[in-house]
Structures are given as C-alpha cells and as structure tokens.
C-alpha cells in the first residue's frame, strides 16, 4: 500500500548541533541603543530556557468552558571558558583603573547572537546554519568555582543565567528572540527572492565589514554600495545614497558617512530591519 506521507526521506532527516560565533552588543547609554558588537571567544554552550505559557482551565456549566495560556518569557544560559572585556559591565563589574575592577555594580543589558549548525543525512553539518538574536538580555550573578591545580587537565568555566525583556514588532506578540535559518532557501536554483543578498547583509551587519574598497573616480556605484574615502588617518566609510551611473570625482552630496576608519563596526539589527531584508520570510 502506498501512503501520501513519505517518512524519513533521503535528505530530510534533520538535526541541530553546536554553538559558535557568539557576539555581544552592550547597551550604549549615550546613544540609547545597542553599541558595537564584540566577538565572544571561548563560547562553549548556550541553553535556551523559555518559561511561562502555562495553561489555566476555566469551568462553567459543569464542564471545562475554555483554557487560556499566560505569556511566555525567554531565558538563556551562556557558558564559556572566558568572556570579552566588554561583557564586564554586563556582569556588574566596573573598571576603576587599569587592572582594577569593582564588583556588584549596575548590570548593563545587552543583545546577544549565536549560531548553531543545522545538518541532515546527506550533507551532514555542511547543510546550513541558524542564527539566533536575543534582545534585552541581562545576566544574573553566578557562582565560580576555583580549585587547586592537580593532575587533571580540566579548566574552570563560567556560566551566566540570563533573562530578557521582549521588544515589540507590529502584528505579533512582543518577543525577545528571533531565529534566521540560512538553510531555508539553499535549494533554490536562482536567487530570485534576494535571499542570498539578505543573508550577506545580515552577516555583514552582525559581524561587521572590513574588505571595503577605496572610492574610485573611474567606477560607477549602485545604491547602498560602500566605499572608503579620505586622506591617511582621516578615512571613513561612506554609503551611496542613490545609484551613481556616471563615473567622476568625489561628491559629498552622493554619499552618506557610515563610520570612521576603514571598516563598518558590527551591530545588531532590529527585528524590523531583518524583516525588511527578508521579505519572503516576513510574508511567510
């Protein structure tokens, strides 16, 4: 007998594994937004721990009349061999002087991104990946165990239990975390939906962009193209405001300054920005 459903088909046996490419974006009180991203080296694990959403039953007319669930909360724990210096303020530590820090201070909130690997039975771990972005994260105090060096090769690690405050997005309930599955469109023969460009934008936004060419008076540019312009020590990154179809000398009217230096710093995009760059996903 033939069934309409095909169980365990080749190429459709998926799994998710690993944790890598952790980045934190500490809150900048001056700018009132998330600041420049910093790579979290030594990240060994991220555990998601949602809570809430419990069901409550309501009774009437001697029967269960309806049920209702409470709002969910999103928590996570971060585990690592060590942490970046920029995380210290998020962990309630302030710097008094070089090498001198004081604890039990106000804990700064941050955004956090990490990447997991999505695999299948035919391509293994090379199938794809999922990028996770958490907003409004705060880390709770955590214990740290220091013990004598002995004949074991084990090293101490750190674990932070974190809670989140959700952000709003029109048409949906407030949320603290979004997931972008890069493997969703990997089988498309052509990039008609612009997904490849959207992924490139996402990665360059989350991790920053450094390989930016200098402005050339003999080149033309599309809207959004980036260039480096300025004398030695005065370089800055600029974005084309509109398409520049005629080559010519530099005109400041055509360009918007993005950042000082020769690279665009890593930053965390808002949910609206992600949705705007992934129209097929947003239309869902």
Q: Which ranges hold each PLM region?
A:
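Polar/acidic, low-complexity leader/linker segments enriched in S/T/G and N/D
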Residues: 1-47
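Oligomerization/assembly interface segments of phage tail-like spikes and tubes
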Residues: 48-88, 152-167
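Tryptophan-rich substrate-binding surfaces of secreted polymer-degrading and adhesive proteins
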Residues: 211-263, 284
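Acidic Ser/Thr/Pro-rich low-complexity disordered segments
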Residues: 29-35, 117-127, 170-189, 247-252
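Structured, beta-strand-rich domain cores
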Residues: 64-136, 140
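Mixed-charge, glycine-accented linear interaction segment located at domain edges/termini
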Residues: 139-210, 263-284
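Short amphipathic beta-strand/extended segments with alternating polar/hydrophobic composition
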Residues: 37-40, 126-137, 181, 239-240
